[in-house]
């Protein structure tokens, strides 16, 4: 799917004004091998525990984007190279992590987009804590399951509806 977030913003000023199209705060870095991706969101809310991330990525992604609200923690990684490969294998087009990733070199080889706040060498806990398929707040932007995510080098957009046919 070819698009530019800049063009989507320009063509949808009324949606931006109404809040049905939102721009996530520009603090994310690209770690994946794909720089531009779009798809409906699947959401997770958790903190320093990536058990649910693996469980989600083991499912058929069907062209979706996994949005992981890790509370913005910079103390451990929620996604690494193995999970990046799993995302690619199972048809996820991208992962947005409000937190950290690790295995940056491996993630860069994955054919999936991966956006996160930073890299961190420490792995997360494995307690199974967190919830899935709930609205999350990522850097002040609300994202509900099924919202559309559009990401490229200029930013991340969240839309209540698909913007492209």
UniProtKB/Swiss-Prot annotation:
Q: What is its EC number?
A: 4.1.3.17, 4.1.1.112
Can you name one GO molecular function term for this protein?
ribonuclease inhibitor activity
| Enzyme type, top EC level | lyase
Highest taxon above the source species: Bacteria
Binding of substrate occurs at 80-83, 102
Q: Which UniProt keywords apply?
A: Lyase, Metal-binding
Provide the cofactor list for this protein. Answer: a divalent metal cation
Per the record, a Pfam family?
RraA-like
Coiled-coil region: none
Catalyzed reactions per annotation = 4-hydroxy-4-methyl-2-oxoglutarate = 2 pyruvate; oxaloacetate + H(+) = pyruvate + CO2
Q: Which GO BP terms sit in this record?
A: regulation of RNA metabolic process
What InterPro entries does the entry give? RraA, RraA/RraA-like, RraA/RraA-like_sf
Has UniProt tagged this entry with the keyword Metal-binding? yes
Disulfide-linked positions? none
At which positions is a divalent metal cation bound? 103
How is its cofactor bound, per UniProt? Answer: Divalent metal cation.
Self-association or partners: how does it assemble?
Homotrimer.
Q: What does this protein do?
A: Catalyzes the aldol cleavage of 4-hydroxy-4-methyl-2-oxoglutarate (HMG) into 2 molecules of pyruvate. Also contains a secondary oxaloacetate (OAA) decarboxylase activity due to the common pyruvate enolate transition state formed following C-C bond cleavage in the retro-aldol and decarboxylation reactions.
Which NCBIfam families does UniProt cross-reference here? NOT-MenG (TIGR01935), PRK09372.1 (NF006875)
Family, similarity comment: Belongs to the class II aldolase/RraA-like family.
Q: What is this protein called?
A: Putative 4-hydroxy-4-methyl-2-oxoglutarate aldolase
């Amino acid at each position: 799917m070819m698009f530019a977030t800049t063009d989507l913003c320009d063509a949808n000023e009324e949606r931006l004004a109404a809040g049905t199209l939102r721009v996530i705060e520009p603090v994310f870095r690209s770690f994946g091998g794909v720089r531009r991706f779009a798809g409906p969101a699947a959401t997770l809310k958790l903190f320093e525990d990536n058990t649910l991330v693996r469980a989600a990525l083991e499912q058929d992604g069907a062209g979706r984007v996994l949005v992981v609200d890790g509370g913005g923690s910079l103390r451990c990684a929620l996604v690494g190279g193995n999970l990046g490969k799993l995302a690619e294998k199972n048809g996820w087009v991208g992962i947005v992590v409000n937190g950290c990733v690790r295995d940056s070199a491996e993630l860069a080889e994955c054919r999936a987009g991966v956006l996160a706040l930073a890299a961190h060498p420490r792995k997360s806990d494995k307690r199974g804590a967190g919830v899935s398929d709930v609205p999350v707040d990522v850097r002040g932007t609300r994202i509900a399951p099924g919202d559309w995510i559009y990401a490229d080098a200029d930013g991340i957009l969240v839309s209540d509806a698909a913007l492209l046919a």
